[in-house]
Amino acid sequence: MVAESKAANPMREIVVKKLCINICVGESGDRLTRASKVLEQLCEQTPVLSRARLTVRTFGIRRNEKIAVHCTVRGKKAEELLEKGLKVKEFELKSYNFADTGSFGFGIDEHIDLGIKYDPSTGIYGMDFYVVLGRRGERVAHRKRKCSRVGHSHHVTKEEAMKWFEKVHDGIIFQAKKKKKMIRRRRR
């Protein structure tokens, strides 16, 4: 009886808080501006440039060099883009795509699979989708005035996120194979 009343509560309903789309080019310059145009065409808002945190000499990346573009989408537009992205993945994800916080992410190889026309001058870019799930009422933890805590039972868990994905998007979740532990032997 208590479980039924909890399920019927509209505040317990899981919603998409935001969708973050990232295209990492790995270098600044012309390829990055073309990736920015692709993301702007997809999201219909201006993307933000991301900078490298560290210098990696093997990849030829310097610290604070612009290497990626990302965009955060909310509301109905986020749900539409998520639907397009999941269509490309055929509504199939692996269990390790889901985080313990109830969020999940996946990547696609070609942006033209989302319905954008191919332009030879632009090229083809892959992108990462990261979906943050939450419940209504979580704003109380982030507001400026009368800030308070969100209870542990109100947080979205990994299992709840997986059930939500299977129910709302009729998705299929594959169980990830357990990795074998490698036994390293010392040479003597």
Swiss-Prot record:
Top-level division of the source organism's lineage: Eukaryota
Any matching Pfam family: Ribosomal_L5
GO cellular component annotations of the record: cytosolic large ribosomal subunit; nucleus
Keyword Ribosomal protein included in the entry's annotation: yes
Intracellular or extracellular location(s): Nucleus; Cytoplasm
Keywords (A to Z) from UniProt: Cytoplasm, Nucleus, Ribonucleoprotein, Ribosomal protein, RNA-binding, rRNA-binding
GO terms, molecular function: RNA binding; rRNA binding; structural constituent of ribosome
Keyword S-adenosyl-L-methionine: no
Any single biological process term in GO: translation
Family the UniProt entry places it in: Belongs to the universal ribosomal protein uL5 family.
Role description: Component of the ribosome, a large ribonucleoprotein complex responsible for the synthesis of proteins in the cell. The small ribosomal subunit (SSU) binds messenger RNAs (mRNAs) and translates the encoded message by selecting cognate aminoacyl-transfer RNA (tRNA) molecules. The large subunit (LSU) contains the ribosomal catalytic site termed the peptidyl transferase center (PTC), which catalyzes the formation of peptide bonds, thereby polymerizing the amino acids delivered by tRNAs into a polypeptide chain.
Subunit note: Component of the large ribosomal subunit.
This protein's name: Large ribosomal subunit protein uL5
Native source species: Leishmania major
